[in-house]
Curated annotation (Swiss-Prot):
<dbReference type="GO" id="GO:0044284">
    <property type="term" value="C:mitochondrial crista junction"/>
</dbReference>
<comment type="subunit">
    <text>Component of the mitochondrial contact site and cristae organizing system (MICOS) complex.</text>
</comment>
<dbReference type="InterPro" id="IPR012471">
    <property type="entry name" value="DUF1690"/>
</dbReference>
<dbReference type="Pfam" id="PF07956">
    <property type="entry name" value="DUF1690"/>
</dbReference>
<protein>
    <recommendedName>
        <fullName>MICOS complex subunit mic19</fullName>
    </recommendedName>
</protein>
<comment type="function">
    <text>Component of the MICOS complex, a large protein complex of the mitochondrial inner membrane that plays crucial roles in the maintenance of crista junctions, inner membrane architecture, and formation of contact sites to the outer membrane.</text>
</comment>
<comment type="similarity">
    <text>Belongs to the MICOS complex subunit Mic19 family.</text>
</comment>
<dbReference type="GO" id="GO:0042407">
    <property type="term" value="P:cristae formation"/>
</dbReference>
<keyword id="KW-0472">Membrane</keyword>
<keyword id="KW-0999">Mitochondrion inner membrane</keyword>
<dbReference type="GO" id="GO:0061617">
    <property type="term" value="C:MICOS complex"/>
</dbReference>
<keyword id="KW-0496">Mitochondrion</keyword>
Length: 162
């Protein structure tokens, strides 16, 4: 009674051979760590450039919308006053409108520069980590997650505010 085990011993039965197609693929693959690194670098640079273009386009649309609102409000003011505005008043309003636009534009530029510096910093840290630990990419996973979050915040500013 005490000589036998109550349950049979577990034996893992898994194939230890790989398909010929898979082995051939590994042998014929020309991809190296350096080429993967360069591809990743190019992808990151393209993504940052795309984000910059999208942000500039979004900023231009916002400025156009503000200008349109100002033109509409000015047109309404002109209709209400029935031509009582003189050139001095119009030039003063125009200057105030320009100042508002410049202020808004400078605020957006400053915020964008800060975000881009932060993304660039994380990107360089990630690349440094990946080059220091080419075979241990899990060590760099927290940096990769942080980079992905920052890049998505650049792409969609509402992501971080939820």
């Amino acid at each position: 009674m005490g000589n036998q085990q109550s349950q049979p011993e577990f034996v893992l039965r898994a194939p230890t051979e790989f398909s010929e197609k898979f082995v051939r693929h590994l042998q014929e693959s020309t991809e190296t760590d350096t080429s993967r690194y360069m591809d990743m670098e190019n992808y990151i640079q393209k993504r940052v450039q795309d984000e910059l273009k999208q942000l500039q386009l979004r900023q231009k649309k916002a400025i156009d919308a503000i200008q349109e609102e100002e033109w509409k409000s000015n047109a309404k003011t002109i209709k209400d006053s029935q031509g009582s505005l003189d050139s001095n008043l119009l030039s003063a309003e125009f200057r105030s409108f320009q100042e508002k636009l410049e202020k808004q534009s400078s605020i957006n530029d400053k915020e964008l520069k800060i975000k881009l510096k932060e993304v660039e910093s994380i990107r360089s840290d990630l690349l440094k980590c990946m080059s220091e630990h080419p075979d241990k990419s899990l060590i760099c996973h927290p940096l990769a997650e942080k980079f992905a979050i920052l890049a998505s915040k650049l792409h969609n500013p509402k992501v971080g505010s939820v």
